[in-house]
C-alpha cells in the first residue's frame, strides 16, 4: 500500500507546539505555496485533529489524508480545491 504522505511537496514539523501555533504555522506555509502543491503536517497536539480539518474547510484547501490513530499525527493538505 503506497504511503500517501511520502510524496508531499513540503513538510511542516509542528511537534511540541500547542494550539494555536500549529494552525498559524500551516497558514504561513500555505501562503508561500503554489496552488496544487501539497504540505505534510506532523503534529502531536490533540487539537489539530479538529483544527487542521477545520482550517482546510474554512480556507478552501483539500485535506487529502490524515493519520490520527497514533502520535505523531500526520495530515496531507493540498493548497486549493480539486478542479471539478
From Swiss-Prot:
GO terms for biological process: tRNA wobble position uridine thiolation. Keywords: Cytoplasm, tRNA processing. Interacts with IscS. Sulfur carrier protein involved in sulfur trafficking in the cell. Part of a sulfur-relay system required for 2-thiolation during synthesis of 2-thiouridine of the modified wobble base 5-methylaminomethyl-2-thiouridine (mnm(5)s(2)U) in tRNA. Interacts with IscS and stimulates its cysteine desulfurase activity. Accepts an activated sulfur from IscS, which is then transferred to TusD, and thus determines the direction of sulfur flow from IscS to 2-thiouridine formation. Also appears to be involved in sulfur transfer for the biosynthesis of molybdopterin. This is Sulfur carrier protein TusA. It is found in: Cytoplasm. GO terms for molecular function: sulfur carrier activity. The active site is at 19 (cysteine persulfide intermediate). Pfam families: TusA. Its main location: cytoplasm. The keyword Kinase does not apply. Pathway: tRNA modification. Belongs to the sulfur carrier protein TusA family. The keyword Electron transport does not apply. PANTHER family: SULFUR CARRIER PROTEIN TUSA (PTHR33279:SF2), SULFUR CARRIER PROTEIN YEDF-RELATED (PTHR33279). Gene3D superfamilies: TusA-like domain. One of its GO terms (cellular component) is cytoplasm. The gene is tusA.
Amino acid at each position: 500500500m503506497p504511503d500517501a504522505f511520502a510524496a508531499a511537496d513540503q513538510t511542516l514539523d509542528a511537534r511540541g507546539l500547542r494550539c494555536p501555533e500549529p494552525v498559524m504555522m500551516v497558514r504561513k506555509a500555505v501562503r508561500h505555496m503554489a496552488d496544487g502543491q501539497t504540505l505534510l503536517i506532523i503534529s502531536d497536539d490533540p487539537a489539530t485533529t479538529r483544527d487542521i480539518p477545520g482550517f482546510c474547510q474554512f480556507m478552501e484547501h483539500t485535506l487529502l489524508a490524515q493519520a490520527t490513530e497514533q502520535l505523531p499525527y500526520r495530515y496531507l493538505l493540498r493548497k486549493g480545491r480539486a478542479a471539478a
